[in-house]
Amino acid sequence: MKYIVSIDIGGTTFNSGIFTDSLNQVAISKKDKIRFYKSKNDVVDAIVKQVNDLIDSVNISKTDILGLGVGAPGPLDPKKGIILDTPNLKIFKNYHITYDLTKKLRIDTFIDNDANLFALGEWLLSYKKNDIVLGVTLGTGLGFGLIINNQIFTGGNGMAMEYGLSPFEWGIAEKNACIEFIRNKSEDLYGERLSPVKVEEFYHNGDEKAKIIYNEFGKNLGKVLSHVINMIDPQIISIGGGLSKAFDCFSKSMISEIKLYSPSYNVNQIIIARSKLRELSTMVGACQMVKNIKE
């Protein structure tokens, strides 16, 4: 039996997983925080240690590992294995991460946008009967991944679906639909920067300020999604990432906004749902990426 290692690098955390080549989960590490480390090299060394410890914990040989797949925030260059100038992971600006991980771990390493891999994992695990599936990740940033006819849509240069970096009202799209938006709005209304979890707690306790925050968040996300729906007309939109836990707080205003601007949503049965698997989908997508390249 062969195995595949996956690494999910977010804007603030990273963790690793081991799967069989048939995509069955073997082991998942705990999340580690990027802010605990001072430099790029320190983070990479921590990732290497996390992966080696996980491999040792399940007692498998590296000769039985097919490869390692990394999901990281874009924009990046998957063919060269380079993380480019991503606003949510500045410590890795223009960094050839696959070269260093391959060298340090002695495992062939490949990378793609984490939202692409999330979308691929969602398609594989939940929506394989559908031809066009959009994955949306809500967290430190706002990521999009698109599956068309069983494959990740990468565009002509490998950098498609970076819609989160597009102009949107005051700033760029992702700044109006990410964790930073929740923190900024809570500072405006409460006088302090609250975590999304705390605002969600207030929301469920009937707090009006929390309702205002998530209502506006949902409207912003709905406008962004309406643009994407009008361009690609997906059958499925699966929403993941840390903020997807608050889906019931913002979904109503999100859908209302989509109905205003997206004819296809009103005419067709486009499914918009919270991912049941979240980070697991990204890891499975990373494993499938390795299989596609190596097999």
Language model: regions and residue ranges:
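A charged helix-plus-loop insertion that forms the helical arch/lid used to bind
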Residues: 81-91
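A short acidic/small-residue loop/turn micro-motif
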Residues: 33-35, 91-92, 159-162
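A cytosolic small-molecule/anion-sensing beta-strand core signal
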Residues: 72, 79, 148-149
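General beta-strand structural signal in soluble alpha/beta enzymes
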Residues: 109-114
